[in-house]
Amino acid sequence: MLTASDRQLWSGAIGLSFAFLLLVFTFDYEKGWDLSTLTYVDFWTMAGMVRHIIFNGFHPVIPWLAFIFIGMWLGRQDVKDIQMRRRILWVSVSVAAIAEILSIILVKVYPGESGVIFGTEPMPPMPLYIVAGAGTAIAIITICLELTFRYPKARIFP
């Protein structure tokens, strides 16, 4: 993936987000969980460990690998260019806000179990969660970069 193009990174991120949705419709997302205590009952079995790491753990590979691909894309951007930084900031804030607003609307339109598909909760990490989370993360990173470039000699601790 180090040599992947920006388009391939974004395609991979989007693909992983929707692959997770397909997995949720195919397999039991709650298998192995005691949701009343948020403990994973069969974690120390081979099947439970694989399921937890790949699919239904706190930070499963699918779809969390999408965040890595998006981070790789961000790392390739010319963040020294103030216009690029500001464009990335405003797009990321807009994307996060739109994802959250869309989620609120769709969850109200489709209440109950079907509304979970449109949620932005971390468990299960549905596509709108990935979009909102990535937008928020990029915005925070960009704000930190902006402060760093604006105040290069500032220190947090004396």
Regions flagged by a language model, labelled:
Residues 1-158:
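Alpha-helical transmembrane segments and their immediate juxtamembrane cytosolic regions
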